[in-house]
Amino acid sequence: MSGPRAGFYRQELNKTVWEVPQRLQGLRPVGSGAYGSVCSAYDARLRQKVAVKKLSRPFQSLIHARRTYRELRLLKHLKHENVIGLLDVFTPATSIEDFSEVYLVTTLMGADLNNIVKCQALSDEHVQFLVYQLLRGLKYIHSAGIIHRDLKPSNVAVNEDCELRILDFGLARQADEEMTGYVATRWYRAPEIMLNWMHYNQTVDIWSVGCIMAELLQGKALFPGNDYIDQLKRIMEVVGTPSPEVLAKISSEHARTYIQSLPPMPQKDLSSVFHGANPLAIDLLGRMLVLDSDQRVSAAEALAHAYFSQYHDPDDEPEAEPYDESVEAKERTLEEWKELTYQEVLSFKPLEPSQLPGTHEIEQ
């Protein structure tokens, strides 16, 4: 094995060799998942702490290669205060022949909503501010034509100033079969996506926001199902069994037959579920946790709800340029995905330190 690329150094972390530019110092592992492992580091060029994600086996298979390309393109496209932003992307490779590793550099966020819920009881003001930011980021993502599909507390990062960013969006499309075994994911998933009821739309993410908001208010998960059947039962105990109109929209005959076999359950009054909660919070939850996805509020509508009157500013809730999915919808070979990804890595222009939000011109 030859030495590291000029200007790079190697370090073994969690049984993985990392090869990174010398400006990234003090690498410390902070977590790992199915798609890669993450370290915190100090970026000497940006003069700030960052998160560095090393994608695991980015080109191991066609599915991996396509997902790698999609993740990089999504991160490059989305630029919003409440969505994780790409500060840099690099590879130790100097040619397409050697290209096998991809590293993504993003803003370092101290905690996620999972940590927050476990550590402290949140005031209603806290919940307002967090859910407002979550919906503000979601409005932006949805305006690009992207569906997150996997919103859950661990995918929502928060820093010490209570500023929130959405992580890991849009990746679950090809990865569904890998995620079915992962329990906590299911608790936040809209019934129509979990049970393949029908073609779903962006409001699957609104259901997830409802589940997250409920957890922030209660300090515990709203629908912690043990399996799909238990999950559905818990959901219907709160929102009631679907009306004939909703049943008619379910394209899966199997799902329809099963639901019709259940004893009818009425919709619960949410104020009996969330004792002492702000009535406006309960009203908003009632508009998000709706079985009929056509009746759920959109992110833009939810932002205008009276619960957020303290924060809502229609002139400061931006939308995105539409995201062109046609490139990744095409069938390509593994080598073609790799070549496209390599071009995306090379064409990325990192921000100068002076362009970062909240930073000033730094004298060199």
Curated annotation (Swiss-Prot):
Comp. bias intervals (Acidic residues): 314-326
Q: How is its activity regulated?
A: Activated by phosphorylation on threonine and tyrosine by MAP2K3/MKK3, MAP2K4/MKK4 and MAP2K6/MKK6. MAP2K3/MKK3 and MAP2K6/MKK6 are both essential for the activation of MAPK11 induced by environmental stress. HDAC3 interacts directly and selectively with MAPK11 to repress ATF2 transcriptional activity, and regulate TNF gene expression in LPS-stimulated cells. Inhibited by SB203580 and pyridinyl-imidazole related compounds.
Localization, per the record, is: Cytoplasm; Nucleus
| Keywords (A to Z) from UniProt | ATP-binding, Cytoplasm, Kinase, Nucleotide-binding, Nucleus, Phosphoprotein, Serine/threonine-protein kinase, Stress response, Transcription, Transcription regulation, Transferase
Primary location recorded for the protein, binned into one broad class: cytoplasm
Which PANTHER family does this chain map to? MITOGEN-ACTIVATED PROTEIN KINASE
- Similarity remark: Belongs to the protein kinase superfamily. CMGC Ser/Thr protein kinase family. MAP kinase subfamily.
> What name is this protein filed under?
Mitogen-activated protein kinase 11
